[in-house]
C-alpha cells in the first residue's frame, strides 16, 4: 500500500473519530440541558404551626421533640385555675340574670293582666322595658360564659392531625403568649416534592407525568406523579420606583439565565413510608406519561442517568 493511501486512511479515521466525538458530545449536551430533570428539588410536607389561643403558664408538655403523635393527642396544657374561675364567675352571672329575667317576666305579665284600669300605661311600659333590658343582660352573660368555656377548653392544645412534633421549644413552667408558635407539626402522609425546573425544560413536563426521585446521598429511587406547575414566579428584572414607574434591570442580551419554576410532584403512597425530612434535597427526573422501564434502557443511558442523578 502506498504512502499516499496510508495518509488517506489516517485522515479518514481521524475525521470519523472527530465526527463521532462531536455527535456524542452533542447528544450528551442535549441529554443534560433539554431533558426535564433537576438536582434542585426539595422534600416538602404540610406543616402546621401550633400556637395556643390563650396565654398562661405551661403546666404539662407530655410530648417529645420529633415524636409521632395521633390526631387529638395532647401536646401541652396551660395553667387552668384562672380560666376555671372565670368560667365559674360567668356561670354565676348567667344564673343571676336568668333568675332576674324570670322575676321581671312575672312582673311584666302581672301588670299587663291588670291593664290600664289599675295601672297607668307608663307603669306597664316600664315593666316591659325593664324585662327587655334584663333579657339583653342575660344574653350578654351567656356569651361571656360561652367564651370563658371556650378559653378553658383551649388551655389544652391537641394535635390537629397525625404527624411528627418538631422544633419543640417550650417546657413546663414557661409562660406562653396567645398566638406564639410553640411547636411545628409535620403532617403524616402529606409529603411531596417541589422540583425547581428550568423554563427551557417545561415543554416536557405536564400534570400526570411520572417522575423518579433520588434523595441526595441515597441509591433508593422513589416514584411520583406531577401534580401541577407553578402559575408564576417573581420577576426579578422589574420593579416599581417611588413614583410607580417600572424599573428594568440592564441585562446583556447574549447572557440569558433560564428562570426556575416550581413543579409539585406527589409521592406514590408506597413511597410515603420512606421518611426524608422536609427541606432535604433530591434529584428529579421526569420520565413522561409512564415510568421508565430499566430493562429497555441501554447501559450508556443508564450510566448517563446515574451520573446525572448522583448527589
From Swiss-Prot:
GO terms for molecular function: transmembrane transporter activity. One of its GO terms (cellular component) is plasma membrane. It is found in: Cell inner membrane. InterPro entries: CusB-like_dom_1, CusB_D23, MFP_Efflux_Pump, PHBA_efflux_pump_AaeA, RND_pump_MFP. Keywords: Cell inner membrane, Cell membrane, Membrane, Transmembrane, Transmembrane helix, Transport. It comes from the Bacteria. The chain crosses the membrane at residues 11-31. Signal peptide: none annotated. It is a single-pass membrane protein. Pfam families: CusB_dom_1 (PF00529), HlyD_D23 (PF16576). Gene3D superfamilies: 2.40.30.170, 2.40.50.100. Forms an efflux pump with AaeB. HAMAP family: AaeA. Belongs to the membrane fusion protein (MFP) (TC 8.A.1) family. This is p-hydroxybenzoic acid efflux pump subunit AaeA. It comes from Yersinia pseudotuberculosis serotype O:3 (strain YPIII). The gene is aaeA.
